[in-house]
Amino acid sequence: MKLAYWMYAGPAHIGTLRVASSFKNVHAIMHAPLGDDYFNVMRSMLERERDFTPVTASIVDRHVLARGSQEKVVETITRKDKEEQPDLILLTPTCTSSILQEDLQNFVNRAATESKSDVILADVNHYRVNELQAADRTLEQIVRFYIEKAKTQNDLATIKTEKPSVNIIGIFTLGFHNHHDCRELKRLLTDLGISINEVIPEGGSIKNLKNLPKAWFNLIPYREVGLMTAKYLEKELNMPFVATTPMGVIDTAICIREIEAILNFTNQSKIDKEPYNFEDYIDQQTRFVSQAAWFSRSIDCQNLTGKKAIVFGDSTHAASMTKILAREMGIRISCAGTYCKHDADWFREQVSGFCDSVLITDDHTKVGDMIARVEPAAIFGTQMERHVGKRLDIPCGVISAPVHIQNFPLGYRPFLGYEGTNQIADLVYNSFTLGMEDHLLEIFGGHDTKQVITKSLSTDSNLTWTIEGLAELNKIPGFVRAKIKRNTEKFARENNISEITIETMYAAKEAVGA
Amino acid sequence: MTATFKKEVNLVFECETGNYHTFCPISCVAWLYQKIEDSFFLVIGTKTCGYFLQNALGVMIFAEPRYAMAELEEGDISAQLNDYKELKRLCLQIKQDRNPSVIVWIGTCTTEIIKMDLEGMAPRLESEIDIPIVVARANGLDYAFTQGEDTVLAAMVNRCPKKDQLTKPLQAVSFIDTDSLQKEKGPKYDSINHDKDLVLFGSLPSTVVTQLNLELQRQDIKVSGWLPSQRYSDLPILDSGVYVCGVNPFLSRTAATLMRRRKCKLIGAPFPIGPDGTRAWVEKICSVFGKQPQGLEQREAEIWKGLEDYLQLVRGKSVFFMGDNLLEVSLARFLIRCGMIVYEIGIPYMDKRFQAAELAFLEKTCHDMNVPMPRIVEKPDNYNQIQRIKELQPDLAITGMAHANPLEARGISTKWSVEFTFAQIHGFTNSRDILELVTRPLRRNNSLEGSLGWTQLVKSTV
């Protein structure tokens, strides 16, 4: 048992459902007790989804438990098959129902015989993996299922496209700025003359998974989700992949060069063609299109010299951010860390040489303690670090999941590609006090924090509050207390009440509409 | 429309036993830890439970709340670790870090399934670490959303002192000056009610508690205590002869426990929601205490007068309750009295005995207002409900959070049912707040549609 107050990554079934509900026309069935189905709430609220989340909970209650859940699960699957006519139905238990140790594969087999859609069981250990690992695994499982199915049906599209093309793997719902990143990646790849073959899972159709092999290569923007799929496709179909996250000007250039190498390798047979060369593009984008390189050179940023920062997040974003801050902005990283414990080796290797220390933990209190100890000038972390920063009065830029409603801005805010470098530069700029502001603060001894004297509209003071009345007033939350006080006094004056009691307060409230 | 909305003369109950969504009953910790100021809630469950508390309720540990998860890991599930030792370790840590007056263990689906004997372990551990431990099984196998509070209060009944007990709740007195407590409590139990004690049960914010106390005081009835109390060490005395009355419709187990274990006398009344409900509630209590209600009718009339601006917005409008927090019947009754038409009352669980007075009041209200009886659908199937909403096109759907955005996108105004759980809706004083919530989507969408002219924001129809 572990005493837990908060967690960075959710339980496994959340990852599975994120993948399933990202695909078009896939329905997921959760085999779970009432209350475990809050995924629908999260997705509907955070993503502001217009459509009903394609996830149905097949409720396990005392009744179902006593009779065995097979009937209920099979019935729910076949019912959804008729109602929604999905291409695929994916069954997943939760932490809770997985301990019932039922033969869910058997349920699935039975339901499959009665359904038009394909039915599969998400194969995930709910006590050993977290949300991200489960998402990675489920995506691979779905892709494998359809590649194998296409193979047996002999309609796997194995002929490569004429022009260079790519699959983007790992964009999905409730991801950190995933939609914006995807748009930016498409733009970048189009600039390079590479067409987009498939984007999965977000918005992808499982009917098109058999077309995955048509692409020249796969691009995995985030290593948390998609790497397993890419490795499977490499092994099975000999498809190369690029897993360098194009975040920051340097890594974006590295990513483009890796793509270049793959294109030239694939293009070998076509002797007559010129080899691909993206160096001019990289140079042009880095120095002139993206403002980030110039920004960190501009005089405004001189004050970043020697500033200390802390980075914490998922392994992709934390590693990339560490490198950007250290290499591209000249900021000293006192500590870089990730909660992706399963990816610790890779993370250490990536950030080695760019930070003073590394912290691998999924315990937010350790991160908080570290921040308090180091006292950095800025934090780049998750919503939790932002909260810690607020308490310690240290600014924090949010760079990684777990997501929050604020991470679903309506405007365009990618973190990847060249537009992403601008966004990140803005984030860094806004997180530190810079330029003249730094000096002015020194001269005037900090921000003007004098309280604005509360305006009171009650000028005549012939009103008195009884002790009980005052005590009751003090129970009212601070942000509305003044308003309630004013309204109550107004009411008292209008009704010639000179002593305000609890009764007066509530009479005033009741009279508001009268 | 007639296909699904027949004019019924009597209340129709249905049980769809469908796939429906409500929040998990462990959500009750979110308001109970705030209510009982010296408590600590330990939810014994999996990552799934923890992530729910953190996400769906938006309650992070930001305010360093007095609750935590005892997260069950693989070793716990496979029984390789000793539950007792593990819980002892965690509770000792809690005692050291927070020193609460009581630790409430919240059992979950997982502790049910692995048959963890929480009730067996608690007394042993309690005497070993010297902190009272209350065990509540707020699991989703047996309960829905607000019923979590019911399980906690039912468990707390057993910790309330009896009259002949001089001490306060078990062991909670160690550091409190007992003499002063007695002095404080002393006068509460004689005075005006003449040896008839009244204890109200249901968790309400302290301002609402004050309001309801005042309401009864006006009728010369003194409330001798509330369950839960602001502090665990102030739990009310419960004994045979004590009258008890609930303020929330989801507290049927607590009511049963009060009657069976403490031989209390339950006052079955409609719930004090809306001016009509509050008046009926006060009247019922008055009748039990042999008091003639004073100025109650006039008070109700005044409140209604104050609501007139809102009533103009809702009269003749229709509403559909998908069902979530078990407050549905009381809210529907109030809205019908306001002049609305209720198509359907979805409700996760319907205890017809505990809600008998409320149901009778609903029926009477429908007759008085001359509107058809709503269907009451227990354990509704959300998919079927969406089809019915599509067909009936109600002016307002009161739904769980998962359905609100998709319905809005299809031109149906919605209000989150959870808001009624967290807002102050009880008593005369707060009637306005209910209508403020109900009319908000109507007012807002009216003003948007007037100027924008579109309602459908999805490409294909529903």
UniProtKB/Swiss-Prot annotation, chain A:
Q: Name one GO cellular component term.
A: chloroplast
Residues binding [4Fe-4S] cluster, per UniProt: 36
Kinase found in the keyword field: no
Q: Which reaction does it catalyse?
A: chlorophyllide a + oxidized 2[4Fe-4S]-[ferredoxin] + 2 ADP + 2 phosphate = protochlorophyllide a + reduced 2[4Fe-4S]-[ferredoxin] + 2 ATP + 2 H2O
Query: Where is this chain's protein located in or outside the cell?
Result: Plastid, Chloroplast
Q: Name one GO biological process term.
A: light-independent chlorophyll biosynthetic process
Q: What are the protein's UniProt keywords?
A: 4Fe-4S, ATP-binding, Chlorophyll biosynthesis, Chloroplast, Iron, Iron-sulfur, Metal-binding, Nucleotide-binding, Oxidoreductase, Photosynthesis, Plastid
Annotated EC: 1.3.7.7
Residue positions of the active site: 300 (proton donor)
Q: Which CDD domains match?
A: Pchlide_reductase_B
Cofactor(s) listed in the protein's UniProt record: [4Fe-4S] cluster
Q: Which residues does substrate bind?
A: 435-436
Against InterPro entries, the record matches this protein to: ChlB/BchB/BchZ, LI-POR_suB-like_C, Nase/OxRdtase_comp1, P-CP_red_C, Protochl_reductB, Protochlorophyllide_Rdtase
Q: Which family does it belong to?
A: Belongs to the ChlB/BchB/BchZ family.
Q: What does the record give as the function of this protein?
A: Component of the dark-operative protochlorophyllide reductase (DPOR) that uses Mg-ATP and reduced ferredoxin to reduce ring D of protochlorophyllide (Pchlide) to form chlorophyllide a (Chlide). This reaction is light-independent. The NB-protein (ChlN-ChlB) is the catalytic component of the complex.
Instruction: Give the protein's recorded name.
Output: Light-independent protochlorophyllide reductase subunit B
User: Which organism encodes this protein?
Assistant: Pleurastrum terricola
From Swiss-Prot, chain B:
Q: What is this protein called?
A: Light-independent protochlorophyllide reductase subunit N
Is Iron included in the keywords of this UniProt record? yes
**Gene Ontology CC annotations of this record:** chloroplast
The main place the protein resides is: plastid
Keywords, A to Z, come to: 4Fe-4S, ATP-binding, Chlorophyll biosynthesis, Chloroplast, Iron, Iron-sulfur, Metal-binding, Nucleotide-binding, Oxidoreductase, Photosynthesis, Plastid
* GO BP terms in the entry: light-independent chlorophyll biosynthetic process; photosynthesis, dark reaction
Q: Which reaction does it catalyse?
A: chlorophyllide a + oxidized 2[4Fe-4S]-[ferredoxin] + 2 ADP + 2 phosphate = protochlorophyllide a + reduced 2[4Fe-4S]-[ferredoxin] + 2 ATP + 2 H2O
Note how many cofactor molecules are bound and how.
Binds 1 [4Fe-4S] cluster per heterodimer. The cluster is bound at the heterodimer interface by residues from both subunits.
The record's family statement is:
Belongs to the BchN/ChlN family.
What's the Enzyme Commission number for this chain?
Answer: 1.3.7.7
Compartments in which it is found: Plastid, Chloroplast
Organism from which the protein derives = Pleurastrum terricola
Give the record's subunit note.
Protochlorophyllide reductase is composed of three subunits; ChlL, ChlN and ChlB. Forms a heterotetramer of two ChlB and two ChlN subunits.
Q: Which cysteines are joined by disulfide bonds?
A: none
Q: What residue ranges carry the coiled-coil annotation? A: none
